[in-house]
Amino acid sequence: MIKQYWTKQRIWLLIFLMVVGIGALLFTSHNEQFYQQPIAKVISKKTMSKQRVKDQFDNVDHQYNQQLQVKLMNGKYRGQKLTVQNTYSDSQPMDQRYRVGNEVFLTQLRKQGGKLTANVNGYKRDTVIVFLLWLVVLMLLLLMGRSGMFAFLSVVINALLFIIAIEIDLKQNGQHIMLLFSVLAIIFTFISLLLVLGFSKRMLATFAATVIGTFVALGVSMLVFMWTHERGIYYESMEYVTQVPRPLFLAETLLGSLGAVMDESSDIIATLFELKQLNPAVTRKQLFISGRNVGKSIMGPLINVLFLIFMVDTFTGSLLYIKNGNSWGYTYAMNMSLGTIQSLISGIGIVLSVPLVSLFGALLLGKKVQR
């Protein structure tokens, strides 16, 4: 079994990926000269002071003043050393603690009176990001082979399309954001399924169920919004929004629920396809019932996972609200309600996609009963 898995092609692929990974890590560890922003390496640190702070809500924290000696890694002052100050706290909400060996970005680097001065502006993280990306590609290609390659390719293409869509939205100042991201959702679905499943009946059934289930769920939610006059929905709680928040929230919900619906539809279709392979004479009714039963099994866990994903995004903000004397009700309304609404809309899409994908799968894969 092990010999069958580790073929000559896989061994050469592993060697190639290891060489690429080591090369990429070495490059990102020594690429400071390609950055315009000054980069320095911490060569020594010293804690100068420690202060206990307390706010009006009796929250206690400690602030530290670090004195860092750093060595410049790029620019016209490369190789020179300077001393910078850094203030951080135990909670580290908006600050960071630096250690010897860290590479950091500097701002406001200048020479005054023959002495260099600057401010610290965060870690240089490209090595960590490249390592994680390489690890994902390594596992995809080694464990999934060609399917993993196409899955990664679909992610890259979708990411590029997403960036293009954001640029278009910024140029239009959000005037057609729902139309833009609705078209993008359809393209996302088509490209992802085409690359992963290929152009087949499985792909068509999954595509139809995903698109219909997602948009029907969004349509149902918009009807509910209209009937309730959107009472209890606090769009003003969305952070850093420079456009009209309502369509932006709906576009965000559309893309968020799309992945879950596509995941469920793909699982059901894969099961129906296996049943068809095992029993070519299986009828459409049998496939429909089987698909519905599979959907019932995975529907609950998938909704819960989606709910947790939406909620965990608000966890730290909720703690901050409560620690600053706000009630649970106000914290939920201003920090968690939109995530709950997104979870409910996605749940509607997940529920609707079960009969839809079972129906499409049965029609395309099943055998018509002869009368």
Which functions belong to the PLM regions below?
Residues S200, L275-K285:
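Juxtamembrane helix-boundary/capping and inter-helix hinge elements in multi-pass membrane proteins
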Residues V282-I303:
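Membrane-interface alpha-helices at helix entry/exit sites of multi-pass transporters
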Residues D90-T127:
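Extended, hydrophilic extramembrane loops/domains of integral membrane proteins
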Residues S257-L275:
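Short helical (or helix-break) motifs at transmembrane helix termini and adjacent helical loops
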Residues W134-L138, R146-G256:
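Transmembrane alpha-helical segments that form the functional core of multipass membrane systems
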Residues I39-R99:
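Membrane-cytosol interface segments
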Residues M1-I39:
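Hydrophobic secretory-pathway targeting helix
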Residues N293, S297-G300, L308-R371:
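Hydrophobic alpha-helical transmembrane segments of membrane transport and translocation systems
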